[in-house]
Design a protein with these regions (language model features):
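Membrane-water interface regions at transmembrane-helix termini and the short interhelical loops
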Residues: 66-74, 134-156, 222-225, 335-348, ...
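Hydrophobic alpha-helical segments and their helix-loop junctions in multi-pass secondary transporters
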Residues: 97, 101, 161-188, 206-207, ...
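Selective recognition of specific alpha-helical transmembrane segments in multi-pass small-molecule
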Residues: 51, 55, 59-60, 159-172, ...
Length: 454
């Protein structure tokens, strides 16, 4: 019996779905800013960024299919039922009201409103007013899901990509400086690969892939593919198409960001950099189109995230707290967080991402290695113990200095720096994760040994 697989046309359609899930206008702020920081060391920065911003997210989606899971809670539940609930909540809050949703509003404000304000304008007040209107629309459409997100997806997203292509082409044809002539900032001078690897965390796409992988799998199933192995294979092959497009966009963005240093000083964040580049090459009309398309693209992303988070938490509470209540709560909370500003949101998100990304990556890798240990829970638990224990130190290290001082974290951070390999690269969790995995495999092997007969 022949197992049905997707045709090339169907794979392209799935790739489009994946691209729509992963790539939002907010993603562009990271590669452009990365290019400005990396300068002449753009190549190793590109490689590092693509690993965590493209490769891991695609594997995250495929992990749901490989393990035949029906969602993130089922996959993370292989560690334990309680852990599955905990990790699902933490992940959705991170890509929801804590960081990703507020970031959408602030990216729109930074690229659309800030360039219009005078030097003495009360920016905080305008951010408050803008975010109030932005989240009023988010709540309205989250409570009344309909064709608005389809309209934005079919019209605004392609318009944005077209505009972005024109902007990037204009920048590449008339670069502000040669990439080789741009001095990198201190953090990227001696080693650009590892900082860029961590910079890719900011896209939050790896954890988003775990959260929304089931959506893509359902799309494939509706196309008539019902074999789990075939589904996983189709996700991977479609993901390669998506990854190639995302990688191309990121490479161009990083190069243009580096070249822009010949025109501008290092910007505070990528939103400001993108606005400066658009204004220089395309003038006032370019700024207007950038603001219009990014605002609507971020609006669509916010509506989708509020909807996904509200549905997930409503299901987890068995409907005792309604979808409507969760949607209102998440929208109001996101509105409040958005008013700390884009740079602050990015800064405060780093410690959380340093905490949640290591176990997310470990979970993805365990999903693919699971066939070698029959997805034994012991291996999952042992790996996660090592990963979480070390990730906590990585999180401590990236907390703002006043917080480190207030919590007296100097001693534990110094301990980790002395005993964890790669801790200086923000990858101190790698060796403990490997040790945990090895310990889990050893425990499993010892359990399988048959006692000798006498």
């Amino acid at each position: 019996m022949t197992t049905k697989k997707l045709t090339l046309r169907q794979k392209i359609l799935v790739a489009g779905t994946l691209f729509g899930m992963f790539f939002g206008a907010g993603n562009l702020i990271f590669p452009v800013h990365l290019g400005q920081m990396a300068g002449q060391n753009a190549l190793p920065a590109i490689i590092g960024f693509i690993i965590t911003a493209v490769g891991i997210p695609i594997l995250g989606v495929a992990a749901i299919g490989v393990t035949h899971s029906d969602g993130l809670q089922t996959l993370s539940g292989k560690v334990g039922k309680g852990y599955g609930i905990f990790f699902t909540c933490l992940l959705y809050l991170t890509i929801g009201p804590l960081f990703a949703i507020p970031r959408c509003a602030t990216v729109s404000f930074t690229t659309g409103i800030t360039p219009l304000l005078g030097a003495d304008s009360p920016e905080r007040l305008y951010l408050l007013l803008f975010s109030a209107v932005f989240f009023a629309f988010v709540l309205f459409f989250s409570l009344r899901p309909g064709k608005i997100t389809v309209w934005i997806g079919k019209i605004i997203n392609p318009l944005f990509l077209f505009f972005f292509a024109v902007l990037m082409l204009a920048a590449l044809l008339a670069p502000g400086a040669a990439v080789s002539a741009v001095e990198p900032v201190e953090a990227y001078r001696s080693d650009a690969f590892f900082p860029a690897l961590i910079e890719g965390y900011g896209t939050m796409d790896a954890i988003a892939g775990l959260a929304f992988g089931i959506v893509v799998i359902d799309v494939i199933r509706r196309m008539g593919v019902d074999n789990d192995d075939a589904i996983a294979e189709d996700v991977l092959s479609s993901g390669l198409l998506t990854g190639a497009l995302m990688a191309l966009i990121y490479v161009v963005s990083i190069v243009v960001g580096a070249q822009s240093r010949g025109l501008f000083e290092l910007s505070e964040n990528g939103g400001i950099a993108l606005t400066q580049i658009a204004g220089h090459y395309l003038g006032g009309v370019g700024l207007f189109i950038l603001a219009f398309t990014i605002t609507f693209a971020c609006l669509k992303t916010s509506i989708g995230l509020v909807t996904a988070c509200a549905e997930t938490f409503s299901k987890m509470t068995n409907g005792k707290i309604s979808y409507r209540s969760w949607a209102i709560l998440f929208t109001v909370f996101s509105f409040a967080v958005s008013n700390i500003g884009l740079s602050a949101i990015i800064e405060y998100s780093i410690p959380m991402l340093m905490l949640i990304y290591p176990p997310a990556i470990a979970l993805i890798l365990l999903a693919f290695l699971g066939k070698f240990f029959a997805h034994d829970r012991t291996v999952y638990i042992a790996t996660m113990i090592g990963t979480w224990a070390a990730a906590i130190f990585d999180c401590m290290k990236t907390l703002p200095a006043p917080v480190q001082t207030a919590l007296h974290l100097d001693a534990p951070i110094a301990f980790a720096a002395a005993h964890l390999p790669l801790f200086d690269k923000n990858l101190g969790w790698l060796l403990p994760a490997v040790i945990g995995f090895a310990a889990g495999m050893a425990i499993r092997a010892s359990r399988r040994q048959t006692p000798a007969s006498f």
